[in-house]
Regions:
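N-terminal low-complexity, intrinsically disordered segments
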Residues: 85-101, 135, 139-182
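Conserved structural core of kinase catalytic domains
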Residues: 158-219
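Conserved kinase catalytic-core segment
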Residues: 208-243
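Catalytic activation segment of kinase domains across protein kinase-like and atypical kinase folds
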Residues: 239-309
Length: 393
């Protein structure tokens, strides 16, 4: 389907991951509704259901085309200029492919692949088709911009622009354009068919799914803890929350056996404590950091099997890796202060502190049950790891 965003015609073609060929009339999927994934706090797994109001694949692709050729044109130019700094002036792609990648809880992201000469530029266009998605998008765009200032460059996607496009029946479809991390994939706890044990599988859509080694798994948990702790503001207690491995908030790439991690979402970035006009005192900030750390040791171990199955609890290797990543991200003085506080707690006291944290931050009843079932061994393992860190920092 050719359109004219600039001087010449540019062909835009549509695809859906998992389906062969291009999607256009009279393809049987063209007029079928988009599925959605919703999470019910009472349920053990996500549920798939049709959208209300109904948005078809045709509605979706037409809205994306309207964005790319209308309100999104300056956003595309900004992205192309960032990706091709050697090119000057306006850059017109030779062609585009729009690939509907997945049906998420909040967004239906499309990968927008543009050919510019010999270069191929991939971007992501996150599209919200529900009220929950729209509300999440407004919060996330603000969060990503603030979090990016605290993280190493390239750790989170750059947002190039946002617009609301009218779909069928004048339904408003908000969407924003951002970086696509090429070669990175979702990962989840999964049962390895070779030995029947639990491992971590990478959904490599370019080749084939594969399982990580234990060393690579530990590196994943270390980097997750490092990025979330770097994003945490100890002065204000601002942090990324909620986040969840089951939602695919982090993605990874393995090169020469080394793991590279990216954070691709930040649904909310807000403080957990509110101080008076003078702000929080040092004791309050230290206690807030303690709560953040202990919650991180729990949440970093939670996933769903294959992303959508039963709640899953990681192997103990995640504990030492989480502790390592956390302390690597902290300034030395703050790390020393927290180690002093943690050193005052015994094994039983650690369980007493973790219990209300698990109750407060558990997102779903099934996850709370999972945490409480594993709380005693988790606390014991965490205590042993902390003793090693405190006495041999």
């Amino acid at each position: 389907m050719a359109v004219n965003p600039g001087e010449g015609l540019i062909e835009i073609r549509y695809r859906i991951t998992g389906y062969e060929g291009f999607i256009q009339p009279p393809h049987p999927l063209w007029q079928t509704p988009l599925p959605s994934i919703t999470r019910d706090a009472r349920a053990s797994a996500p549920t798939r259901e049709a959208q209300s109001p109904t948005i078809t694949h045709a509605d979706y692709f037409r809205a994306v085309r309207s964005y790319l050729t209308g309100a999104g044109r300056p956003h595309l130019q900004q992205a192309l200029a960032a990706c091709l700094p050697q090119r000057k002036g306006s850059i017109d792609p030779d062609g585009m492919e729009v690939i509907l990648e997945k049906h998420g809880e909040f967004y239906h992201p499309a990968r927008v692949v543009m050919a510019v000469g010999e270069a191929v530029i991939p971007l992501v266009l996150n599209v919200a088709v529900t009220q929950a998605g729209s509300e999440c998008m407004a919060s996330e765009m603000a969060a990503l911009g603030r979090v990016a200032q605290r993280l190493p460059p390239g750790s989170v996607p750059t947002v190039y622009g946002y617009a609301v496009v009218s779909g069928s029946d004048e339904v408003a479809l908000p969407m924003f354009l951002a970086d696509w991390f090429d070669g990175f994939h979702e990962f989840h706890l999964s049962i390895d068919p070779q030995d029947g044990g639990q491992g971590m599988v990478v959904w490599d859509t370019d080749a084939a799914p594969y399982f990580l080694s234990e060393q690579q798994q530990a590196e994943v948990y270390r980097q997750v803890a490092f990025l979330l702790t770097r994003a945490y503001n100890p002065e204000t207690t601002e942090q990324i929350y909620p986040w969840h491995h089951a939602s695919g908030d982090f993605i990874l790439r393995v090169r020469s056996a080394s793991v590279e991690l990216r954070l691709i979402t930040g649904r909310r970035y807000a403080p957990t404590l509110k101080g008076n006009e003078e702000g929080l005192d040092d004791d309050a900030r230290l206690v807030a950091l303690l709560v953040f750390f202990l919650n991180l040791t729990l949440r970093n171990r939670i996933d769903r099997l294959d992303g959508t199955g039963d709640p899953a609890w990681s192997d103990p290797l995640a504990v030492a890796a989480t502790v390592q990543g956390f302390f690597e991200a902290l300034p030395h003085e703050l790390a020393a202060a927290l180690m002093g506080l943690l050193g005052a707690y015994g094994r039983a006291e650690l369980v007493d502190i973790l219990t209300p944290i698990a109750d407060r931050y558990g997102l779903m009843s099934m996850e709370k049950d999972l945490i409480h079932a594993n709380l005693a061994p988790h606390s014991a393992h965490l205590f042993e790891v902390l003793q090693r860190v405190i006495h041999d920092p």
